[in-house]
Amino acid sequence: MRVVSVLGLDVGSKRIGVAGCDPTGLIASGLETIVRCNLGADLDAIRHWIERRRAQAVVIGLPRNMNGSLGPQAHRIQHFGQQLARVIDVPIDYVDERLSTVQAGRALQSVSATRRKALIDQQAAAIILQQWLDIRRCQHRPTQESLDERHIDTER
């Protein structure tokens, strides 16, 4: 069995949630919440996680409007993805993240408000990554095949 390592990112204006998957590529879990400083520091922090986890790909949540169109925040995230692509050597994919933060909040409902604030972004990143992993599994596309495509997909 091949080991799989993919990172999921929930990119917000103040924080970036980071998630990773288990070696089988079946289960995503939160890793860290990066408090945003500036673009260089943000990219360095993500690059650190890519190196630490030996990530083969990065999945970024793309916040579409409820009608499926891309709004200003989605365009900012695509721009962030383009900046990230310049400093890493792994493919980047995007997945629709509509309501992932709402789902994350519900999942953390029993956690104290202070702890929830610290965890919500990484939980949203885990939801984004889990969705990506599940889509590949449902399409009968092994995660490794998806990684081998090495493209930036902005149409999803």
Swiss-Prot record:
GO cellular component, one term: cytoplasm
First-listed, main subcellular location of the protein, grouped into a coarse class: cytoplasm
Subcellular location: Cytoplasm
Keyword presence, Hydrolase: yes
Recorded coiled-coil stretches: none
EC number: 3.1.-.-
InterPro entries: RNaseH-like_sf, YqgF, YqgF/RNaseH-like_dom, YqgF/RNaseH-like_dom_sf
Protein task: Could be a nuclease involved in processing of the 5'-end of pre-16S rRNA.
Protein name: Putative pre-16S rRNA nuclease
Organism per entry: Gloeobacter violaceus (strain ATCC 29082 / PCC 7421)
